[in-house]
Amino acid sequence: MRRAVVLFSGGLDSTASLYWALKHYDEVIMLTINYGSQEERVTNKVAEFFSRELNVPLKIVKIDFLHEFSKIAGSKLVEGNVPEVTARELEDFEKAKETARSVWIPARNFVLIGVAASLLDALGGGDIIVGFNKEEGETFPDNTKEFVDRINSALKYATMNEVRVVAPLIELDKKGIARLLKELNAKYEYSNSCYNPQGFTEDGKPIHCGRCESCVRRHRGLIEGIGEDKTVYLVTPKV
């Protein structure tokens, strides 16, 4: 039996990865990890929605130390105002790197993969499904194929059972992810990409700020990829 744990943060990437995993594995478990980021005020509800919608078991784990370390690092994801960007600024590599640094969570993906690996090792092994993609890999080094390859090398020594990381979106940009979501009939409008979400609509859709980097990337990818965006925004991003 093929088993997978999907690291689910609630955004487009992990939502696409979740739907993909359900097509490729016999047993799928969602794992959402709370570390004190500002978007967690909606993340858990998003995870619970997809768990119910897709009938997938969900585990929510809290790790307080990562919140503490992120505050030391000055990450705007856990404290302060997240930077606002335009679509044009995203094309400026130095500006994009600067924005990435401001929301960086110290060794986040390394830590989260470790938690997922521990769960899978306890269950007898399996694959960790992550939403790493080509577009974010340009500014976040822990979203790259090189990172996945090196993590998988380490996991051979770190677990008693066979555990590996699988990144089905690694060659895709946001446009490609949008097309995959449409192909999989995913209810992406119930996912949340926003660093500073504004609550929910009456029917349970997250309200995105429309101003942060993640909102701009999301809207641009959906419009350019499938020609529509069902996401609810406080302010519609300009692309």
UniProtKB/Swiss-Prot annotation:
ATP binds at F8, S9, G10, G11, L12, D13, S14, T15, A16, S17, L18. Pathway: Purine metabolism; 7-cyano-7-deazaguanine biosynthesis. CDD domains: QueC-like (cd01995). It catalyses: 7-carboxy-7-deazaguanine + NH4(+) + ATP = 7-cyano-7-deazaguanine + ADP + phosphate + H2O + H(+). Pfam families: QueC. Keywords: ATP-binding, Ligase, Metal-binding, Nucleotide-binding, Zinc. Zn(2+) binds at C194, C209, C212, C215. Its EC number is 6.3.4.20. It is an enzyme of class 6 (ligase). InterPro entries: QueC, Rossmann-like_a/b/a_fold. One of its GO terms (molecular function) is ligase activity, forming carbon-nitrogen bonds. NCBIfam families: 7-cyano-7-deazaguanine synthase QueC. HAMAP family: QueC. Belongs to the QueC family. Catalyzes the ATP-dependent conversion of 7-carboxy-7-deazaguanine (CDG) to 7-cyano-7-deazaguanine (preQ(0)). This is 7-cyano-7-deazaguanine synthase. It comes from Pyrococcus abyssi (strain GE5 / Orsay). The gene is queC.
